[in-house]
Swiss-Prot record:
This is Large ribosomal subunit protein bL35. The keyword Ribosomal protein applies. Gene3D superfamilies: 4.10.410.60. GO terms for molecular function: structural constituent of ribosome. Keywords: Ribonucleoprotein, Ribosomal protein. GO terms for cellular component: cytosolic large ribosomal subunit. One of its GO terms (biological process) is translation. InterPro entries: Ribosomal_bL35, Ribosomal_bL35-like, Ribosomal_bL35_CS, Ribosomal_bL35_sf. Belongs to the bacterial ribosomal protein bL35 family. HAMAP family: Ribosomal_bL35. Residues 1-25 are annotated as: Disordered. The lineage of its organism: Bacteria, Pseudomonadati, Pseudomonadota, Gammaproteobacteria, Thiotrichales.
Length: 65
């Protein structure tokens, strides 16, 4: 049986956590941020957890994560 390939786009966007979940970067911070308040930019700075519903599809996309 051949090796399973990892989807490189998913590997760049998501990281696995210790308990088996996934985390990702917050959206809406790429450009045109001058109209955003400092508070909004600060809250978008960290990482977010991926919903449990989407975790199964990420496991299939990244079998060795």
């Amino acid at each position: 049986m051949p090796k399973l390939k990892t989807k490189s786009s998913a590997a760049k966007r998501f990281k696995k956590t210790g308990k088996g979940g996934f985390k990702h970067r917050c959206a809406n911070r790429a450009h045109i941020n001058t109209k955003m308040t400092t508070k909004r930019k600060r809250h978008l700075r960290g990482m977010n957890q991926v919903a449990k519903v989407d975790t199964t599809s990420l496991v299939q996309q990244m079998p060795y994560a």
